[in-house]
Amino acid sequence: MTKDIHQHRILILDFGSQYTQLIARRVREIGVYCELWAWDVTEEQMREFNPSGIILSGGPESVTEAGSPRAPEYVFNAGVPVFGICYGMQTMAEQLGGKVQSSTEREFGYAKVEVLGNSGKTSALLRNIEDAIADNGNALLDVWMSHGDKVTTIPADFTTIAQTATCPHAAMANEAKRFYGVQFHPEVTHTRQGARMLEHFVKDICGCECLWTPATIIDDAVARIREQVGDDEVILGLSGGVDSSVVAMLVHRAIGDRLTCVFVDNGLLRLNEGQQVMEMFGDHFGLNIVKVDAEERFLSALAGEDEPEAKRKIIGRVFVEVFDDEAKKLKNARWLAQGTIYPDVIESAASKTGKAHVIKSHHNVGGLPEEMKMGLVEPLRELFKDEVRRVGLELGLPYDMLYRHPFPGPGLGVRVLGEVKKEYCDLLRKADAVFIEELRKADLYNQVSQAFAVFLPVRSVGVMGDGRKYDWVIALRAVETIDFMTAHWAHLPYDFLGHVSNRIINEINGISRVVYDVSGKPPATIEWE
């Protein structure tokens, strides 16, 4: 009998750290299922979840301030291992009888942690982990710190297992109860041995089996889809993006031709994208796809509108209308498949303290009219984006499609600045295709996180041969980022940029000038609109 891939599970309580989702991704990478909940979870909810272990995340608040978040008391009475990270360690120490105070010496960035005494051999968390050896024989670890407060007195029955020059209790442990705390962040790559610490906690201390893999995720999703929809038919809005493509493959594997994919060509796609989607999913994979040519409908709705948020809302509204029209033709479709992923679920979860993330509006079919009365099939709702990509590879989708740069939901509608016209979209499509083609040829595409062209609705004088021309301007944008929350503009070679500019101006009639965007985020956003 196949094992339940959710059988061993870790609960991560979120105290507001920017790295909390990273903790969950690291646990998943180990091969163990986990969920991320707000810190104010009830005992009943935790009992129902029945975790094999609990991780307390970092957070921006101070344990020394009244009203700051605390872990539910049940965390320390549940009889399972607990791992406190940064703020998580501080609230653990304070709640179990230790002391925390604000420090005059804040630690931000790299630090060297010394593993004390015999802890490098006896501590289940830090056993046999080292980056270097100190003169006294103790293990040294390169870690990433981000804290102002620090633990000054550890609780009774705890021992200090690591320290820094300014932080006397950089890590603490109660080996009998399997409680551990570290003042640094093992989830970030800057902490070189962080993945091994998390693996020690999840596998060795919590005893979790590695049941969470792309292959087992697929088997589980297929079984769930079959159980959920029975003999009914399913409809899916297929965009050709990563999420909807993986959903299409999963649902098709589960129910075959009872899935109908609706591909809406809104006239705001990249060059030849509609043709590529139809060839890949229709011809190659044999999915049942209905293609709707709705370019005129979208462009008519956008005519005269130049405000970015209004354009986004128009594109979202018209998509819903077009999709609704097609769905009504499929009389037997009882279910709607969507590409909701786990970060969407997290961001939409409201904490009773009001400290959860804000709900995002997505440009998918989530806003379909209530009268459609369809059930939702969301096979990716437990997965992070990197997991979706790995599942896609396992399903046979091409690497280049799964790992291509992000493309906004409204498409070229927010890369044509101001009013959107067919002429502008056609010029932008061609310029963008040249830029991406040259990035790939120069082996630069995978060295930047996102690259694209932007159409600027301004004319500029140019010289072609013996004549002058007065044509449009294209901006090129390329950024390097880890999380898309902040980004640096990519320092592409001057010769490369010159070559791309020459190709765009010489090969695309209607463009007279190319500029390169050297703005970081912040203060600028990655997209121009």
Swiss-Prot record:
Glutamine amidotransferase type-1 domain sequence ranges: 9-211
Binding site for ATP: S239, G240, G241, V242, D243, S244, S245
Catalytic center residues: C86, H185, E187
Gene3D superfamilies reported for this sequence: 3.30.300.10, 3.40.50.880, HUPs
Domain GMPS ATP-PPase: from-to ranges: 212-404
GO CC entries: cytosol
CDD domains: GATase1_GMP_Synthase (cd01742), GMP_synthase_C (cd01997)
Catalyzed chemical reaction(s): XMP + L-glutamine + ATP + H2O = GMP + L-glutamate + AMP + diphosphate + 2 H(+)
Keywords: ATP-binding, Glutamine amidotransferase, GMP biosynthesis, Ligase, Nucleotide-binding, Purine biosynthesis
Cited Pfam families: GATase (PF00117), GMP_synt_C (PF00958), NAD_synthase (PF02540)
EC number: 6.3.5.2
Cited InterPro entries: Class_I_gatase-like (IPR029062), GATASE (IPR017926), GMP_synth_C (IPR001674), GMP_synth_GATase (IPR004739), GMP_synthase (IPR022955), GMPS_ATP_PPase_dom (IPR025777), NAD/GMP_synthase (IPR022310), Rossmann-like_a/b/a_fold (IPR014729)
Superkingdom of the source species: Bacteria
GO function term, MF aspect, one: GMP synthase activity
Pathway it works in: Purine metabolism; GMP biosynthesis; GMP from XMP (L-Gln route): step 1/1
Subunit structure: Homodimer.
Function field: Catalyzes the synthesis of GMP from XMP.
Protein's name in the database: GMP synthase [glutamine-hydrolyzing]
Source organism (scientific name): Aeromonas hydrophila subsp. hydrophila (strain ATCC 7966 / DSM 30187 / BCRC 13018 / CCUG 14551 / JCM 1027 / KCTC 2358 / NCIMB 9240 / NCTC 8049)
